[in-house]
Amino acid sequence: MEKLLAQLIRLYLMPGQATGQHPAATPLVSDDGLTRAIVIDFPRAAGDESGHWAQLCEVANTLQEKLGFPAPAVSVTGADAFRLWLSLREPVPVADVRRFLSLLRSAWFPELPLHASSTVELPPCLHGATGKWAAFIHPGMGASFAGEEGLDIAPPAAAQLAFLEGLESIAPAQFEEALAAMHRPRETAPPQAPLAAPPDGLLLKDATLEDIVRHLHAMGIEPSFRHVLPGRA
């Protein structure tokens, strides 16, 4: 767990920020209003089990395709939502994060709220109300969690670590350029060059179980997904 905590500190927590003993007590914003994380919730809507996953994929793909950001982390909350985790290499004022999300909504997602959390439960942790586990997940598995965004049993620490070790943070210049690009009038923005092939981090389609097992085996990890599927009648 120490290695996993080190990755959470590397990617998302402010210097000197204590994680505490209770997962619900982890702040992402320092006392002077700075943050290194943009964590966006995508809650499940009533009567729509998969729409929030599609929304997360659209936002994640746009951030990478249009703004050139590195691949984000994805988690389930143990309740009824997915989370998208963006890491900033250097702290920025919370006001800049709000401005970034406001510009992102205006540019591509006017129908989505896209609010950043200031306090968050650090996966893996047990959700007190549901008894399900919050956990980081392989992006290709997201659709399989739609409608039941949690794990029945604690996830393997090695797999959680593997999902974070290869992630990169958004550089200060990337963040500033993204703000500038979204602030420019749409008609004067430079055209985006077409991508020859989707980068590895994109969430354009769901990976098969075999893809995920192969990915974890390549890292020397024996997978144990620990998600109990409901029995068939």
Labelled PLM ranges:
Residues M1-D80, S87-L103, L203-E210, S224-V228, ...:
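Signature for HUH/AEP ssDNA processing cores
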Residues V29-D48, E90-H227:
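DNA replication initiation modules
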